[in-house]
Swiss-Prot record:
PANTHER family: ATP BINDING PROTEIN (PTHR32182:SF23), DNA REPLICATION AND REPAIR PROTEIN RECF (PTHR32182). One of its GO terms (molecular function) is ATP hydrolysis activity. Keywords: Antiviral defense, ATP-binding, Nucleotide-binding. It comes from the Bacteria. One of its GO terms (biological process) is defense response to virus. A motif (ATP-binding) lies at residues 92-99. Probable ATPase component of antiviral defense system retron Vc95, composed of a non-coding RNA (ncRNA), a reverse transcriptase (RT), this protein and a putative HNH endonuclease. Expression of retron Vc95 confers protection against bacteriophages T2, T4 and T6. At multiplicity of infection (MOI) of 0.02 cultures slow growth when infected with T4 but do not collapse, at MOI 2 cultures enter growth stasis. This is Retron Vc95 probable ATPase. It holds the Pfam family AAA_21. SMART domains: AAA (SM00382).
Amino acid sequence: MNEPTRIPKYVKDKIRQAKQGDLYSSFTVSEYYYDGEVLERDIEQSELYLRNVSRIINNAKIRLRNISLYDYKKFSKLKFTSSEKNTTIIIGNNGSGKSTILESISKCLQFLSDNIRIQNNNNYKFQDSEINIHSISGQTIVRCILEIENDFSFSCSLTKNRENISRKVSSELEEFKALARMYQRSNELDNNTLSYPLLAYYPVERSVTLKRDDAVKYYERKKAKYSDKSEGLKNAFDGTSNFNDFFSWYKEIDDIINEFKANDSITKEEIEYLLSKTDNKEKIGSLISQLLEKKNNYNNNEDREFLIRQQKVIQESIKTFVSDIDQVKISRTPHLDMTVIKNGSEISIFNLSQGEKTLIALVSDIARRLVILNPSLENPLNGYGIVLIDEIDLHLHPKWQQTIVQKLENTFPNIQFILSTHSPLVLTTVTSEQIKIINELDYRFKLLSPTSNPFGKNASDALAIMETSESPLVHSEEILALIKKYESLVKRGQEDCRKTKEIKKTHRKHWIYI
């Protein structure tokens, strides 16, 4: 009789922590039982612990808590902590580093996303040029902390060392790789029905011109698999290709729905074939019933309803952002195109304004990915994730700038948005706690929140937060003071008084302003 294998103390500790509900320990114990190296192989026990993991992470809230940069690009040291609310907005002057912060976050999110798609993927992109030129250590470190359901933290540290340094620092990847394996293994356990988080970055380059020919060629080259969950993670950090992916995916769904509809009815050719078989009306009726039953059996009503629901979700999300668009459809004649019904008229989506196209491309891509990543949710737009958007105000009319954040939060209520902007109108739609200002003093950087709250205020209050005058700086402070003095005198009905005339006479060259 074999003696039972002695269980090491660290394994006992993991089992105890797993029974107390710790996510990481539950997955580790599941792996122990599955691998059979530390514990005796027991698939049933492995699945038992994995069920606990799946229960926690399926459609779980995921958030970026903070990211720390060391000698990354212009920042020798910087820590970004996200707002407790769903949206955080980074502001600063041109060249202050807004995009750099978003890029650093995207590197960590992309590493997690790539590992969910491909197990044990150690690849991440860093260039030597991303190391701060004044770095004494000769290395850059980007350290990120994510939270699941506010209870479980996972950290990742990405490092790039210069070739010529002797003391190199290693990346710390294991926790993110473990989190990715949790999603993979749980999805296998749940027969591909588990919800994956949406992780995506939309850089400024997303505003490239959308062309119908490019989208059609892309579709012909790559026909999307509408049910492939990995499609929801692919190219999520390359904003330039997203609309073509959406076009291809939407066209594939539309084709399948049309095929289902075609099988709901009997064609003229089928009727002529039945008539050629017999003149007996009762027999013809029986044959028609048999044919319809056969077609109905061919159609998978569950699949059809699922696809129609997906299509409707996309259309509703676009309509939320561009209210005068009633419908999005695929047109096949005289050529393949995507069209919209706008104010009662059908128009190619590629002929809309740049602002409309930029917004539709962004919204449709987020919605498409959520639909793919959340196959079991009644409303997939309620899926969780983290989305980064650089210059959210890009090409948007001021009216849209005032509503974009609210619409993003209402349409995608469980997404954490981290945005950058130059628009004071955007800032008037969030609280001071949601705003992070890049502050530099003697080459040291900090992210600060404004002391005044711009929410619901005038744009002038937001301009003050951005340290920008509400009046164009075309005059000296002295001239601006005189202009205000003149305006005050006129408003009091003293346009003919000596002081008013003196200002007018002395500063005649500024007559256009006073």
